[in-house]
């Protein structure tokens, strides 16, 4: 594979497109936000995303997606952010689950666990790489009282993150910056710690984003990441395995899924020292991490859990898809909205299957450190 070409930094273009597409919809939530979009701009976003996904899994197809990583991810989150918040909440990640623990509680605990493993505290300035709409950052700053800067290449998500920070009176602790995590604009050695929660999977090359994180970390600084990877059981030459990986890629805006070994080696190659690593999806939990997608209502703990899991279950996703299709047909939802829900359905099916076969994990946890002194 030839070297990946870094994206052009055209933040003014992105901002103008965001305003044209989303307008004031960042103040709304769920399907009401979807209805408020510009129909023409949404069609452009859908076309820009789905042009990469026609079933092609050749090296040439893959290389095109890798080289367009920035716009691919930008268009993806322009299309799916409202669906994510409607179905899942404001923390766009999976978690481990225990009996007696509600869905929201498990989400917070998963975030707390990362902060605990990293030893984050109130004296730290921390970078959240790929911060989404700020759900994890809000929880972690409440838990540790640290200052967090969120990095995101999607202007709409930044608008929503700022909206929530002000709403919950956390804007003195939280700030958000537009940027490409493959070419960060921060000064070198400007953060005490960096974390990424299921975000660096969008990088075309893991070594690229990890090297940028290494650069902005102070010597002795810690980096913690929940990484999406294919496990050691995954076989790239196995047609069924590759189909599962492709389904995850197309439905989640990922240029290419990499293996655990690739992620680990990438961390080492840029200079990190691995202090802790564990696949938290492979610990024989009674309740699987993918249960909200598989629709196993028996694991729900609260009434709110039943609502969440129903929305994210196969039946709930079917209802959402058909409802959105009807809204699109009568002109309420932008053209391409139903295609987006179909892609999310493909992702859900393959995430569950990848989890059941232990081919995929969304929570390969690495806690690594930048050495105090450079190695010769």
UniProtKB/Swiss-Prot annotation:
Keywords: Lipid biosynthesis, Lipid metabolism, Methyltransferase, S-adenosyl-L-methionine, Steroid biosynthesis, Steroid metabolism, Sterol biosynthesis, Sterol metabolism, Transferase. GO terms for cellular component: endoplasmic reticulum; plasma membrane. Substrate analogs 25-azalanosterol and 24(R,S),25-epiminolanosterol act as inhibitors. Pathway: Steroid metabolism; ergosterol biosynthesis; ergosterol from zymosterol: step 1/5. It comes from the Eukaryota. Induction: Expression is induced in the presence of fluconazole and up-regulated in azole-resistant strain. Expression is positively regulated by the transcription regulator HAP43. Expression is also induced by N-acetyl-D-glucosamine. Expression is repressed during spider biofilm formation. GO terms for biological process: ergosterol biosynthetic process; methylation; zymosterol metabolic process. GO terms for molecular function: sterol 24-C-methyltransferase activity. Disruption phenotype: Does not affect the susceptibility to azoles. Leads to hypersensitivity to cyclosporin A (CsA) and FK506, inhibitors of the protein phosphatase calcineurin. Its EC number is 2.1.1.41. Sterol 24-C-methyltransferase; part of the third module of ergosterol biosynthesis pathway that includes the late steps of the pathway. The third module or late pathway involves the ergosterol synthesis itself through consecutive reactions that mainly occur in the endoplasmic reticulum (ER) membrane. Firstly, the squalene synthase ERG9 catalyzes the condensation of 2 farnesyl pyrophosphate moieties to form squalene, which is the precursor of all steroids. This is Sterol 24-C-methyltransferase. The lineage of its organism: Eukaryota, Fungi, Dikarya, Ascomycota, Saccharomycotina.
């Amino acid at each position: 594979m030839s070297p990946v070409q870094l994206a052009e930094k055209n933040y003014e273009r992105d901002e103008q497109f965001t305003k044209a597409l989303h307008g004031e919809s960042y103040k709304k939530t769920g399907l009401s936000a979807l209805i408020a979009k510009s129909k023409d701009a949404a069609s452009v976003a859908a076309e820009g995303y789905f042009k990469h996904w026609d079933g092609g899994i050749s090296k040439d197809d893959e290389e095109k997606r890798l080289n367009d990583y920035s716009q691919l991810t930008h268009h993806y989150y322009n299309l799916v952010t409202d669906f994510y918040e409607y179905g899942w909440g404001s923390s766009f990640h999976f978690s481990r689950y225990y009996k007696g623990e509600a869905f929201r509680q498990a989400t917070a605990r998963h975030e707390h666990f990362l902060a605990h493993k990293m030893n984050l505290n109130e004296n730290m300035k921390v970078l959240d790489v790929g911060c989404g709409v700020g759900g994890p950052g809000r929880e972690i700053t409440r838990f540790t009282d640290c200052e967090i800067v969120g990095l995101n290449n999607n202007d709409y998500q930044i608008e929503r993150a700022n909206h929530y920070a002000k709403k919950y009176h956390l804007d003195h602790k939280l700030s958000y910056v537009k940027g490409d995590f493959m070419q960060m604009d921060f000064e070198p050695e400007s953060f005490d710690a960096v974390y990424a929660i299921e975000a660096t999977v969008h990088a075309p090359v893991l070594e690229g984003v990890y090297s940028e994180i290494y650069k902005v970390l102070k010597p002795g600084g810690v980096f913690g990441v929940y990484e999406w990877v294919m496990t050691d059981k995954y076989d790239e030459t196995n047609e069924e395995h590759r189909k599962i990986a492709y389904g995850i890629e197309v439905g989640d805006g990922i240029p290419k899924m990499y293996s655990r070994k690739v992620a680990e080696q990438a961390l080492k190659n840029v200079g990190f020292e691995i202090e802790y690593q564990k696949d938290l999806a492979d610990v024989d939990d009674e309740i699987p991490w993918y249960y909200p997608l598989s629709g196993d209502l028996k694991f729900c703990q609260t009434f709110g859990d039943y609502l969440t899991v129903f929305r994210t279950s196969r039946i709930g996703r079917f209802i959402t898809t058909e409802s959105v299709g009807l809204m699109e047909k009568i002109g309420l939802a932008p053209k391409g909205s139903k295609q987006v829900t179909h892609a999310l359905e493909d992702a859900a099916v393959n995430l569950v299957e990848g989890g059941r076969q232990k081919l995929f994990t969304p929570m390969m946890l690495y806690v690594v450190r930048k050495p105090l002194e450079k190695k010769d």
